[in-house]
């Protein structure tokens, strides 16, 4: 969309940051490789359950970030002479009239041939590892600053770069669950790994009734939590099927899982050249939007 002119650089960076945020918020990124996500798509990704955010990663979203990192790596290592575009065009030329598909690792070999770069170590990290993606360092090489911070609220999907003190966000208390409104009640759809809800013993499909003796609803849940602090312990009443249960839940601070991107003001000449080649605009054009 950026290349076609439908959106500008700021909007593109916002969308990209929101994709990164979505991946960062799933513990499954640390448990399932991108290759396994693709392999198990029909048995796991398209049959998701309440534990999926803890065990799976999307080969669509993480895959798009892997492609981004590959593209920027090629641009950097070739001093802007090659990019992922060259690889895709080379594949198109090679297989245009071929009745045969691309082999499992053949794509990687062709990418090395076309770019003239050793890429195997990068492919291993992007496709067959659960290591964190090197987003910040790679984007810095093309003059983009990445900010990783806690969310401002449950509605914060990322993309907004904050210039103020972020320490206040680190003191924002969270339950570590995802919820949905169910006939006016708060139903837990997911209990996230390492969160306060999981530590307290809550489970997906539990229906919250009260916090510290006060009725909880979809309308007041966030406000009830916002008045507390990390480390506070709440008495939680919830129904699990038809059984009323009680839990002692100790609130945890919000994790740094929200991404924002912006053009770096202090980018050097090499970074600016790579950034222009990637975004297709000069620094002056990008900042004037």
Predicted regions mapped to residue ranges:
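C-terminal recognition in membrane/secretory proteostasis and scaffolding
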Residues: 6-289
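An active-site-proximal "capping" alpha-helix that borders the catalytic cofactor pocket
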Residues: 1-2
């Amino acid at each position: 969309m950026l290349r076609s002119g439908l959106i500008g650089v700021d909007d593109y960076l916002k969308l990209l940051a929101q994709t990164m945020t979505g991946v960062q918020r799933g513990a499954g990124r640390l448990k399932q490789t991108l290759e396994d996500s693709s392999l198990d798509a029909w048995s796991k990704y398209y049959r998701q359950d309440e534990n999926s955010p803890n065990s799976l990663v999307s080969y669509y979203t993480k895959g798009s970030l892997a492609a981004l990192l590959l593209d920027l790596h090629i641009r950097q290592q070739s001093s802007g002479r090659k990019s992922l575009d060259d690889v895709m065009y080379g594949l198109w030329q090679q297989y245009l009239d071929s009745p045969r598909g691309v082999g499992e690792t053949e794509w990687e070999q062709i990418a090395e041939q076309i770019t003239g770069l050793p890429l195997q170590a990068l492919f291993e990290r992007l496709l067959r590892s659960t290591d964190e993606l090197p987003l910040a360092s790679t984007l810095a090489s093309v003059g983009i600053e990445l900010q990783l911070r806690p969310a401002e609220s449950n509605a914060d999907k990322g993309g907004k770069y904050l210039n103020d003190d972020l320490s206040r966000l680190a003191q924002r208390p969270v339950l570590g669950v995802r919820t949905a409104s169910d006939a006016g009640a708060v139903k837990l759809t997911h209990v996230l790994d390492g969160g306060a809800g999981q530590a307290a013993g809550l489970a997906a499909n539990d229906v919250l009734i009260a916090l510290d003796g006060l009725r909880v609803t979809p309308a007041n849940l966030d406000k009830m939590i916002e008045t507390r602090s990390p480390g506070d312990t709440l008495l939680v009443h919830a129904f699990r099927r038809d059984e009323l249960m009680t839990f002692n839940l100790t609130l945890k601070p919000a994790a740094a899982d929200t991404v924002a991107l912006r053009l770096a003001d202090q980018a050097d000449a090499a970074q600016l050249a790579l950034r222009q080649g990637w975004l297709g605009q000069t620094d002056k054009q990008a900042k004037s939007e």
